[in-house]
Amino acid sequence: MPQHSVLRDGKETKRTLPYNRQYVILAIYEVLDKNGAEYEKTDASTVISNMSVYGNLSRFSICVTEQEHGTELSVTMLQPCEGLSASGVQRAITAVADSISQYLENELVMSGIFMQKNR
C-alpha cells in the first residue's frame, strides 16, 4: 500500500510505492505516452513534462528515488495552467501520481508479475 504525503506549498506530493525503481520509471513513461504528453528526461531519476490533466495543460516534474522499502515517487507542479486554483493544482498533482500508481498496480499486481518476482 503506498504511503502518501503532500508538502505544505501544495504543489508537490510524494508517495512511497512498493516497487523497484525500474518499474516506477517504466510506469512514468507509459503514463506520459498514453496521455500524449511532451516530456524530457533531465537526469536518470527526473522527467519534466507538459501534460493535460482534466483539460488543463500544466508543467510537472516527476522524480523517483530508491528507498530501502520501495521507491519514492515525487510529483511537483512546476507551472500550473493559467487560472488554475490551488485546489485544482492539488487535484492535478494527485491525478498524475494516481495514474502512475494505478498503472503499476494494473500491470504488475493484477497480472501477477509482481507477486512472482517477489517469491
Label each region the model flagged:
Residues 1-119:
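Ser/Thr-rich, low-complexity intrinsically disordered terminal regions
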